[in-house]
Amino acid sequence: MSILVIGGAGFIGRRLVPILAADGHAVTCMDIDVAGAAAAFASLADKVTIVRGDVTQFDDVIGAVQESGAERLINLSYFIGDLPPHVAFKLDIQGMDNCFEAARRCGVKHAVFASSLAVSGPQDYFGERLVDESDERRGESQYAVNKITNEWQAHDYRRAYGMVITCIRPANVTGPDKKFGSIDHVNCMCQPARGQSVTFPHADTRRCVIHVDD
């Protein structure tokens, strides 16, 4: 199967691409960081095709879909944290729309994108009970609200065109090489292992973590 992974050189993509290649899929990684992708997948040169592309540019996205002959598209391209609003909109919202529209025009059979547990908002809204996908989305940060918007975009494309789009809401993805976004949970595990102290910004900080390899 031909799979296009957009943002494949990122924290999650670096793990996902080799798994897909090992399963026998024809994988294309589109990323703005071609050098990083080449380094990450150096041992998979005969199994992974790397193309430079900017998710905010529709021509880059649809070009990658067409060139790869993608049957499946996975979008992992995102900024973790806050950006100036105009920049955040282009990357997080317009970028996602570019992926969905390119998938629609090219007849991609299945699109997958990473949303986030952040869409639910703080646990305080729900008390001590478990939160699931049927609960109200109460995220308030730029990151969370943009993810909520992405979920609405996916719903709109499914409604309008009957597309198959899967949204995944990971928890706080953790791993020793995570450098951006919420890294307090990374520091909590890694710094003591290195003999270093760890500091949390708030005494009542709570995280729901999942290892990146999972």
Residue spans for each PLM region:
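N-terminal Rossmann NAD(P)H-binding glycine-rich loop of SDR-like oxidoreductase domains
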Residues: 4-23
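Conserved catalytic-site region of short-chain dehydrogenase/reductase
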Residues: 82, 114-128, 142-148, 173-177, ...
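Glycine-rich NAD(P)-binding loop of the Rossmann-fold in SDR/ketoreductase-type enzymes
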Residues: 56, 72, 87-98, 137, ...
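NAD(P)-dependent short-chain dehydrogenase/reductase
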Residues: 155-207, 212-213
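Conserved Rossmann-fold NAD(P)-dependent oxidoreductase catalytic core, especially the SDR/UDP-sugar
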Residues: 75, 98-142
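Rossmann-fold cofactor-recognition segment
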Residues: 44-57
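Conserved glycine-rich Rossmann-like NAD(P)H-binding loop of the short-chain dehydrogenase/reductase
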Residues: 25-36
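NAD(P)H-binding glycine-rich loop region in Rossmannoid oxidoreductase-like domains
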Residues: 55-91
